[in-house]
């Protein structure tokens, strides 16, 4: 079993993610364990597939192997674009302007993305609308707030939990705090992680991996 462990430290809090070798684990399973895993994943697949179908019907562009809550799907519109192998646990995404999410992105629960503000220098106090682009291999964990002044989170960016993001995040930067500031650079991205498996949404990937057994 190959395990990769990395830490993010911000505000004196440490986080650890343990990633098991997905392909090796599935290929070495007994037939009984494989079928059991398939049954569990089928139940989750039905739920997540329904959400994706609803989001697409509402005009959103959704890639393959995407896990998202039903509540987000019901609020989706043509401003939402999501790539492949994405896990989203929040429904607090402001879709009054385009939000583009790349491939292999992880967004945790209670994270909020805001794309609209007000013109504080105007007597009418009218709305000001912005969009957000989240590039590939970005990790946004729990309870992050992304304000309209942030327009892009670049490739491999990581934001620590509870942070308030007020400006763009550079590629491979690890940021945290309020306001979020960079405190280190990420050494690699999670290329070996099957992102959709984090919430049990890997029904198709699970089957394909098993079938490729040599």
Functional labels for PLM-detected ranges:
Residues 21-79, 211-212:
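Extended, small-residue-rich solenoid/repeat segments and analogous flexible loops
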Residues 121-122:
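A short acidic, helix-capping loop that chelates divalent metal ions and anchors anionic groups
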Residues 10-13:
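Ala/Thr-enriched low-complexity intrinsically disordered regions
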Residues 77, 96, 125-129:
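Residues at secondary-structure transition points
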Residues 26, 126-146, 178-214:
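C-terminal segments of enzyme domains that contribute to small-molecule binding surfaces
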Residues 64, 69-70, 83-84, 88-90, ...:
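Left-handed beta-helix
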């Amino acid at each position: 079993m190959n395990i990769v462990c990395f830490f993010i430290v911000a505000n004196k809090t440490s986080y650890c993610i343990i990633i098991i070798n997905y392909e090796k684990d599935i290929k070495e399973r007994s037939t009984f364990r494989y079928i059991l895993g398939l049954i569990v994943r089928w139940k989750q697949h039905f739920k997540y597939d329904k959400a994706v179908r609803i989001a697409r019907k509402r005009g959103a562009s959704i890639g393959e192997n995407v896990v998202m809550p039903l509540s987000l799907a019901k609020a989706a519109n043509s401003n939402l674009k999501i790539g492949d192998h994405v896990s989203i646990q929040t429904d607090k995404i402001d879709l009054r302007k385009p939000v583009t999410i790349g491939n292999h992105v992880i967004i945790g629960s209670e994270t909020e993305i805001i794309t609209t503000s007000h013109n504080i220098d105007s007597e009418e106090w009218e709305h000001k609308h912005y969009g957000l682009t989240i590039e590939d291999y970005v990790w946004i964990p729990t309870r992050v707030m992304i304000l309209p002044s942030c327009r892009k989170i670049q490739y491999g960016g990581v934001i620590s939990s509870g942070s308030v993001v007020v400006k763009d995040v550079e590629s491979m930067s690890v940021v945290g705090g309020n306001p979020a500031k960079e405190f280190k650079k990420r050494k690699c991205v999670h290329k070996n992680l099957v992102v959709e498996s984090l919430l049990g949404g890997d029904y198709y990937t699970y089957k394909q991996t098993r079938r490729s057994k040599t």
